[in-house]
């Protein structure tokens, strides 16, 4: 899909750019979150509205893609095969406006001395060059897809936001080469959108921006039919790798604790329906072995998290074992133990 075919919403009313079948691999071209209109360190923005006057809106997403056979209730599985950075322009940009300081806004007065600030970071193979007053720092690239989602059941949702029922701007560093994102399908064809690639991003995206860049994202799409997974009803997007199972808590406007609850609840259900554990067993296993990555924690209610567990400690669903199968009505199948 060409980057020129982009918008600023996850919108089921938009005509598909391309129509593909399950199992199709293709390339999605993207702009950065500033539509590649911030390209010089001399572009400084004392107020956020000055930045918006230049770029119009944040977070262009390329799409939508219609996937034949995807129906409401199914899940769309999107495998990230490769991320090529800087294919449109070989740099990443990060900035802080004078009135939008991220986590440290209003709390760390020394920031005021250096704001606003814009930093243009050239891409050099597997390295991004981060300029500072004491010389250039060379950071290893950690490519990731920041925004990926399907169309909501009704209306449109801003590409800057995120919701459990369709994904969106979840900014999860683990959405990278080799991972598979599983998104709810709400409309026929799913209508997939993708954008906001980062060359690297620190956990929590504390400034509000990462190393924002353009890219060509190679993906493969597949469909997980609802009929093939009875009883398994995801409450939020899922993210798996070769070594982990995971869920993403992403209710826009919710506090961090609630998004942790969403992700843990979904992962408990995954372990129950797919790996033969009771809810209590799954809960206690997660208490012992889960890992939590804070994707975003920029301002009040702007949070998203990724909770994962290693496949090595999860029962293999293909191998039955004594004492591992319990009914939902078992006395110890509810509660925190």
For each feature predicted by the language model, list its residue ranges.
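Conserved mixed alpha/beta catalytic, RNA-binding, or beta-rich assembly cores of soluble enzyme
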Residues: 141-257
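N-terminal, Lys/Arg-enriched amphipathic/low-complexity engagement segments
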Residues: 1-53
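Short, well-ordered loop/turn sites that connect or cap secondary structure elements
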Residues: 20, 67-70, 175
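Short, structured beta-strand/loop micro-motifs enriched in basic residues and often containing a Trp
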Residues: 2-11, 54-62, 158-166
């Amino acid at each position: 899909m060409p980057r020129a075919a982009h918008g600023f919403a996850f919108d089921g009313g938009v005509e598909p750019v391309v129509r593909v079948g399950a199992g199709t691999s293709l390339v999605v071209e993207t702009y950065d979150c500033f539509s590649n209109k911030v390209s010089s360190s001399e572009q400084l923005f004392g107020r956020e509205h000055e930045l918006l006057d230049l770029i119009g809106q944040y977070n262009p997403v390329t799409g939508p893609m219609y996937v034949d056979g995807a129906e409401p209730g199914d899940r769309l599985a999107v495998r990230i095969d490769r991320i090529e950075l800087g294919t449109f322009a070989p740099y990443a940009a990060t900035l802080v406006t004078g009135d939008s300081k991220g986590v440290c806004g209003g709390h760390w007065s020394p920031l005021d001395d250096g704001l606003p600030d814009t930093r243009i970071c050239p891409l050099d193979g597997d390295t991004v060059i981060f300029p500072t007053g004491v010389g250039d720092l060379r950071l290893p690239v950690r490519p990731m897809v920041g925004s990926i989602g399907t169309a909501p059941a009704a209306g449109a949702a801003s590409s800057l936001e995120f919701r459990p029922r369709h994904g969106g701007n979840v900014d999860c560093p683990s959405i990278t080469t080799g991972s598979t994102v599983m998104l709810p399908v709400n409309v026929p064809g799913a209508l997939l959108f993708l954008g906001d690639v980062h060359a690297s991003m620190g956990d929590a995206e504390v400034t509000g921006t990462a190393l924002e860049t353009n890219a060509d994202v190679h993906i493969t799409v597949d469909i997980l039919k609802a009929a093939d997974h009875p009883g398994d009803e995801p409450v939020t997007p899922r993210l798996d790798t070769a070594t982990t199972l995971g869920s993403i808590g992403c209710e826009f406007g919710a506090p961090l604790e609630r998004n942790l609850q969403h992700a843990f609840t979904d992962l408990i259900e995954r372990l129950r329906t797919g790996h033969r554990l009771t809810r209590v067993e799954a809960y206690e296993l997660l208490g012992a072995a889960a890992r939590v990555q804070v994707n975003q924690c920029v301002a009040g209610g702007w949070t998203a998290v990724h909770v994962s567990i290693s496949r090595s400690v999860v029962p293999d669903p293909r191998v039955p074992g004594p004492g591992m199968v319990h009914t939902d009505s078992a006395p110890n199948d509810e509660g925190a133990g």
